[in-house]
């Protein structure tokens, strides 16, 4: 297998979808086999490769083609102000990318905002949806037990509005259960991504002012989703409440949940080995 790194797997596609006309999407494309599309979260500086770099190798070695798009308005993809809820627009961007690449059907892995995109994709394009793997997905409305928005979401919006290294540290301290793993390399890498395109930050805020988070809620339609689904959650998630996982398995047609202890909002990173074993087994046998 050729060397697996960000630069060697990097490419761009141009899509034409509603709200995304002549729009460039950056992605990383690695491996061969059944397609798995990994959708990243919505924090400032997020991107496909950085969100999943602890998972790409094991998936490729297991015989999957892994595609990691940067969502519209993130990392190397074009910037955008959205007039519709972000999960739906992101789902359209995935469909557009698949069209350009000639991919008819794919499994979807989605973390946080990426989970919201995966849910919307399954609702809009069920015939093109394989299995779903969701980690603390957004887009599920209020919580029965937790005041919303949660602490992490408040810090996320603070970082978008007033980007600083100190606010980034505060957000990462909430983002991860074990704060000792927040290395200077992780911090500086994320900070560099944030600074690379200030328009992304400004346009995220403008989009949120036009379409609030409450508009993302697809709870009423969960029963329509037929795709086999693995839901994972960090017991200590301070961005999206744990009871949303119960909402998913109570309403979706074929879903089960796995909760990681000593884990916050980034299960695929904090518990990478266990996550990789669990999800690869689900794709092969679930």
UniProtKB/Swiss-Prot annotation:
Active site positions: 265 (proton acceptor)
Pathway this chain belongs to: Xenobiotic degradation; biphenyl degradation; 2-hydroxy-2,4-pentadienoate and benzoate from biphenyl: step 4/4
Known EC number: 3.7.1.8
Sites annotated Transition state stabilizer: 112
Record bears the keyword Hydrolase: yes
Reactions that this protein is recorded to catalyse: 2,6-dioxo-6-phenylhexa-3-enoate + H2O = 2-oxopent-4-enoate + benzoate + H(+)
Gene Ontology CC: one annotated term: membrane
Alphabetized UniProt keyword annotations: Aromatic hydrocarbons catabolism, Hydrolase
Enzyme category, top tier: hydrolase
Alphabetical list of Pfam families matching this protein: Abhydrolase_1
Keyword Hydrolase: yes
GO annotation terms (biological process): biphenyl catabolic process
Residues that hold substrate according to the record: 42-43, 51, 111, 180, 190, 266
GO molecular function, one term: 2-hydroxy-6-oxonona-2,4-dienedioate hydrolase activity
Gene3D superfamilies: alpha/beta hydrolase
Subunit and interaction comment: Homodimer.
Record-stated family: Belongs to the AB hydrolase superfamily. BphD family.
Functional summary from the UniProt entry: Catalyzes an unusual C-C bond hydrolysis of 2-hydroxy-6-oxo-6-phenylhexa-2,4-dienoic acid (HOPDA) to produce benzoic acid and 2-hydroxy-2,4-pentadienoic acid (HPD).
Protein name in the entry: 2-hydroxy-6-oxo-6-phenylhexa-2,4-dienoate hydrolase
Organism the protein comes from: Pseudomonas sp. (strain KKS102)
